[in-house]
Amino acid sequence: MDRLFFLDHSPIDFYFKQSPETFVVEEVPLYPFSGAGEHLIVKVRKKNMTTWQMLQSISEQVGVKIRDIGYAGLKDKNALTYQYISLHKKYEEALKKFSHPLIKTIELTYHKNKIRRGHLKGNRFFIRLKKVKPVDAKKIDEVLKILEEEGMPNFFGYQRFGIDGDNWQLGKEIVEGKRKERNKTLKKLLINAYQSHLFNLWLSKRIELSKLLNCFTQNELSQTLDLPRSIIKELQCQKPFFKLFPGDIAMHYPNGKIFGVEDVKGESERFFAKAIAPTGLLPGVKTKRCDGLARDIEKDYDDERISEFGDRRYAWIFPQELHGIYKEKNAWYELSFFLPKGSYATVLLEEIAHRKIKGE
């Protein structure tokens, strides 16, 4: 699917091919490790291999079962990545003998708990863009300023949808009963891709509505949107680009509980201050849906036949520590930034480029 971009600048020309030299990811833990406890915490560097391949190699050499290795999240294959894993400290001596050409243990400490999925604040990224002209470097500088000030949409990246980008279609067929999948792990993966696809469609729709509200008058919108003028006025008065709708579900930022948006004006001020952010639906069971006007939009991107657990996901995020430097001699533009967990650096790159970057 072609997602809708938040910014309206013309496409920026650069070359990006993901590799350990151009793409570095460093995991930021959710909490500091205590230095004491029965769990060995290991900072691991890997390149050109998946997290699963890394875990398999450690399991085989150290003698620990994969299910007994804790990790917070999966990291890119075609990259240089740093992440933390945990295993019982009885494996420490065996781990010290571990050797692999693509994996290196950087540091060791201890903690009382095992690392669990999702136990990370986010990730720091370093990205090198190539074949960047001076005029395009200046454009990138301007885009980074906007993204740091205003944030960006939290789309799922192309990696979520498989090599051919059609995993969501297979997941939809499973939900519809048109396809059987015996492998439970693969079945969940495909349905998750379908949930993510619906989220991306909804987010594009909300960006489209926000663009309309930012660009047209009340008179023009009253003829286009089936909304009372009072609602249009309330929406247009909001400072953020991305408009909150009555009945939206928001969440404290960068983490916290979800809550229903009742005071649209007040909550939009908190959103502008980066204290909260709206959320979108990942359809599934035991998941809260929006109310009112927000639900009128959301329902077109819901599928109540999905039997997997659903969730709410930030629709909008605020990149931090954004830095860019242009190396004219090499025609490189190097940027670094922090994103919260579950957010995609490639989505930020595509927002900068104003085009798809997969396959370059």
Swiss-Prot record:
The alphabetical list of record keywords is:
Isomerase, tRNA processing
Q: Which domain of life is it from?
A: Bacteria
Q: What is its EC number?
A: 5.4.99.27
Q: Name one GO molecular function term.
A: tRNA pseudouridine(13) synthase activity
What biological processes does GO assign it? tRNA pseudouridine synthesis
Residues at the catalytic site: 76 (nucleophile)
InterPro entries assigned to the protein according to its UniProt record, in alphabetical order: PsdUridine_synth_cat_dom_sf, PsdUridine_synth_TruD, PsdUridine_synth_TruD_CS, PsdUridine_synth_TruD_insert, TruD_catalytic, TruD_pseudoU_synthase
Which PROSITE patterns is this protein grouped with?
TRUD, UPF0024
Look up keyword tRNA processing and say if it applies.
yes
Task: Please state every residue range assigned to the domain named TRUD.
Answer: 151-332
Family named by the database record = Belongs to the pseudouridine synthase TruD family.
Q: HAMAP family from the entry?
A: TruD (MF_01082)
The function of this protein is: Responsible for synthesis of pseudouridine from uracil-13 in transfer RNAs.
Q: What is this protein called?
A: tRNA pseudouridine synthase D
Organism per entry: Nitratiruptor sp. (strain SB155-2)
